[in-house]
């Protein structure tokens, strides 16, 4: 008896085969970046803007693969992609350290290029939205001078109590600068980027770029048909069963 995974793989293969038989050009259209943007908008997914994002730098190994891969494919045209990677890894491990130096130099130069591009694309002094409480804490930093022996935790607790007292003693505080839900200030863009990297692990971030196809499912087939603009006039009796 087949496992659930095997049955789902077989079902997905059948669905994709049926779709491709009805729309011969669907793969070409599906991989088109403009189509991915339109489709993402149709199903409510906002594509990530990668217009001004500098291209990441390559490692020494990637430069090596870029140079050696064509010769491996030329020697073995029927080789599978995963086997190509095996051959590349083997050749890289056997490559003398002296011969690796040129790829190390290429990697260093490419990293300089990336860092320079990244620096040029930074938007310094971009406004950030913070709460009224944080603005209040920023204004009350002098508490550290009054109580130099307090720990950071104690200072935070004291500021919280002061904030609660401020709201009680100032019923109209909503009309003050602390009353706004968010206060616009300027911040150091580079520091903010570092903070985001430390707070949100890259593996937990939701990414959506046009080059990565969205998963095909039965509920999205209609949207695909409308965006492609093709008809099933020649195959009216053919249906996709999921």
Swiss-Prot record:
Residues 54-122, 126-197 bind DNA. It comes from Invertebrate iridescent virus 6 (IIV-6). PROSITE patterns: HMG_BOX_2 (PS50118). The keyword Protein biosynthesis does not apply. It is found in: Host nucleus. Disulfide bonds: none annotated. Keywords: DNA-binding, Host nucleus, Repeat. Signal peptide: none annotated. GO terms for molecular function: DNA binding. SUPFAM superfamilies: HMG-box. Pfam families: HMG_box. The gene is EF1. This is High mobility group protein homolog. One of its GO terms (cellular component) is host cell nucleus. InterPro entries: HMG_box_dom, HMG_box_dom_sf, HMGB.
């Amino acid at each position: 008896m087949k496992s659930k995974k095997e049955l789902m793989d077989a079902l997905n293969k059948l669905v994709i085969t049926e779709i491709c038989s009805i729309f011969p050009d669907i793969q070409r259209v599906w991989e088109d970046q403009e189509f991915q943007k339109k489709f993402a908008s149709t199903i409510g997914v906002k594509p990530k803007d990668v217009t001004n994002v500098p291209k990441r730098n390559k490692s020494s190994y990637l430069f090596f693969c870029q140079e050696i891969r064509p010769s491996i494919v030329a020697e073995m045209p029927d080789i599978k992609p995963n086997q190509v990677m095996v051959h590349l890894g083997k050749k890289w491990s056997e490559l003398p350290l002296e011969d690796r130096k040129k790829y190390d130099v290429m990697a260093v130069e490419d990293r300089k290029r990336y860092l320079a591009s990244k620096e040029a694309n930074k938007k310094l002094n971009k406004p950030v939205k913070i709460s009224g409480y944080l603005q209040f804490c920023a204004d009350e930093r002098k508490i550290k001078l009054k109580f130099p022996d307090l720990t950071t935790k104690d200072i935070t607790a004291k500021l919280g109590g002061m904030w609660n007292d401020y709201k009680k003693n100032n019923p109209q505080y909503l009309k003050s600068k602390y009353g706004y839900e968010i206060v616009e200030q300027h911040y150091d863009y580079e520091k903010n980027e570092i903070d985001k990297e430390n707070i949100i692990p890259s593996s937990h971030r939701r990414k959506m770029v046009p080059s990565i196809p969205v998963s095909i499912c039965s509920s999205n087939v209609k949207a695909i048909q409308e965006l492609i603009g093709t008809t099933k006039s020649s195959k009216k009796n053919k249906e996709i069963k999921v």
